[in-house]
Amino acid sequence: MVLGNIIEKYTPSKETKDLSEYYGLTSDTDVALICNNEVIDTKGKLVNGEVYLSYETVRIYLNARFYWDPNENILRYTTANDLISVNAESSDYTVNKDTQSFGQTIVKADASTAYIAIDFVKQYSDFQYNYYTDPNRVVLTNAWGDYTIASAKQKTEIRYQGGIKSPILTEADKNTELTILEPGDTWTKVATNDGYIGYIKSNKLGTTSTTTISSDYVAEEFSHITKDYKINMALSLIHI
């Protein structure tokens, strides 16, 4: 009996984590969002095979310059030279007065918010994304810079939390590259390229190195007025 308890104590669990629960998915149209190696609370929507992001998600995580007018059901975006406008449920958009086709519905609106096609957002924003299925999820990146990485030395489990009794999120094959989030002596918190954030035994990781993630997005430049003298902003009070 004692021996059996000891064996049970040191035997790794084979239980797998319910991924819908892990990502907070409640319907087939929900899309989990992983932004800069963090599973965020808000969800995207899958409509006719295309990913849409809520207006709030776009503003908070990707580009605060989009503006949704719920009264007119119009999405607007301003560049240095252009005003872009999109009517809800339309596949067309206008750049100033020129109408262009996007090839799919750009904005889906309901009573509470608007959902914007992710590819339309990307057209005007500095981020990268990859979409995965089983379950539906999008991995977003817009935090550019250096990251610490290491490869799995052998096929091994990535668990929900540190500890051999924690459920398995996914498996990492030998030589799978992982991003190190929180190194530890026994367990290390890692992120996979396809959107799992969990823990791996530290002795299953190879030597760490640094990789640089960069963007090829060309940001637009806004012109501004410059003067070679000071401008007096004092208010003039007129008494009648």
Regions found by a protein language model. Give the residues of each.
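Short beta-strand elements that form the blades of beta-propeller/WD-repeat-like
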Residues: 231-233
